């Protein structure tokens, strides 16, 4: 789309990255793009770095759904969110200059912690901050599903299923399926206490509610993608699939499952 000409570069400051981005900015201007200094002015936001930098870029620019996010890897290979390589500038220019840009949409999750709202691209995690079993009543919609005892839980988007969720044996979910995945962290299962003991998937119209049992473990660590949210006396966390999505450039040779194969196999 030719009206997308304002580009904002998001990256972690370092001498090496500053020099690399200086060259990218010059190249962008040579091809008719306008480099802007605030993300609110941009309709293309380029994240320079790995997947962690991409998550930061999306969060720091407020999960905009009216622009394109572009992930550019620095280290010579692509990542799950970084479709381009910083050394392959021809591919970047060709894709962003195209009259008919194909767009890939990634869903977000809405998270509410005691009435305070957040959004995540990968996952929200809630864990004990002390060496003590964490107890939560788990509700699916209005149904009391179980009382969880263990280290915590992860609730992930389909794209986030490849991250923290996968490292604790959660399933990788096709992002074309609108859902959230709930994965336990070290659940306590014995003759006295019982949880489901496996990940489970909820459809887009379901709401998950975690009610914290106030037994001295009411100061949990809540992870919002790769950021920690610190708060005391947490009573309730609600999670659902958001109606909002972010957009990235879709490449013909870089589908989600090609990325999964490239990353893990």
UniProtKB/Swiss-Prot annotation:
Superkingdom: Bacteria
Keyword Membrane: no
A Pfam entry, by short name: NAD_kinase_C
SUPFAM superfamilies: NAD kinase/diacylglycerol kinase-like
Residue stretches spanning the membrane: none
UniProt cofactor(s): a divalent metal cation
UniProt GO MF annotations: ATP binding; metal ion binding; NAD binding; NAD+ kinase activity
GO terms for biological process, alphabetical: NAD metabolic process; NADP biosynthetic process
Subcellular location as annotated: Cytoplasm
Active-site residues, record numbering mapped to chain: 51 (proton acceptor)
Residues reported in the UniProt entry to bind NAD(+): 51-52, 122-123, 149, 151, 162-167, 186
Any Gene Ontology CC annotation: cytoplasm
Signal peptide from the UniProt entry: none
Predominant place of localization: cytoplasm
Keyword Kinase attributed: yes
Catalysed reactions, semicolon-separated: NAD(+) + ATP = ADP + NADP(+) + H(+)
Keywords: ATP-binding, Cytoplasm, Kinase, NAD, NADP, Nucleotide-binding, Transferase
Purpose: Involved in the regulation of the intracellular balance of NAD and NADP, and is a key enzyme in the biosynthesis of NADP. Catalyzes specifically the phosphorylation on 2'-hydroxyl of the adenosine moiety of NAD to yield NADP.
Family: Belongs to the NAD kinase family.
Name under which the protein is recorded: NAD kinase 2
Organism listed in the record: Bacillus licheniformis (strain ATCC 14580 / DSM 13 / JCM 2505 / CCUG 7422 / NBRC 12200 / NCIMB 9375 / NCTC 10341 / NRRL NRS-1264 / Gibson 46)
Source organism phylogeny: Bacteria, Bacillati, Bacillota, Bacilli, Bacillales
């Amino acid at each position: 789309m030719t009206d997308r000409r304002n580009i904002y570069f998001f990256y972690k400051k370092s001498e090496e990255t500053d020099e690399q981005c200086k060259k990218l900015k010059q190249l962008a201007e040579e091809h008719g793009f306008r480099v802007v200094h605030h993300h609110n002015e941009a309709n293309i936001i380029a994240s320079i770095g790995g997947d962690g930098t991409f998550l930061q870029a999306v969060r720091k620019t407020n999960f905009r759904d009216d622009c394109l996010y572009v992930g550019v890897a620095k280290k010579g290979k692509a990542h799950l969110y970084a479709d381009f390589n910083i050394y392959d500038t021809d591919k970047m220019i060709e894709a962003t200059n195209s009259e008919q840009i194909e767009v890939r949409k990634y869903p977000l999750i809405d998270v509410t912690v005691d009435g305070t709202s957040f959004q995540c691209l990968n996952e929200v995690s809630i864990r004990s901050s002390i060496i003590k079993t964490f107890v939560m009543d788990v509700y699916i919609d209005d149904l009391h599903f179980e009382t969880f005892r263990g280290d915590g839980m992860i609730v992930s988007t389909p794209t986030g299923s490849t991250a923290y969720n996968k490292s604790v044996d959660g399933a990788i979910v096709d992002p074309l399926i609108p859902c959230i995945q709930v994965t336990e962290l070290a659940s306590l299962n014995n003759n006295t206490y019982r949880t489901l003991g496996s990940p489970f998937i909820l459809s887009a119209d379901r709401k998950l509610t975690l009610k914290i049992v106030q037994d001295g473990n009411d100061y949990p660590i809540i992870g919002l993608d790769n950021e920690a949210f610190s708060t005391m006396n947490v009573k309730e966390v609600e999670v659902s699939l958001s109606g909002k999505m972010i957009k990235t450039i879709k490449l013909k040779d870089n589908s989600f499952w090609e990325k999964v194969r490239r990353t893990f196999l």
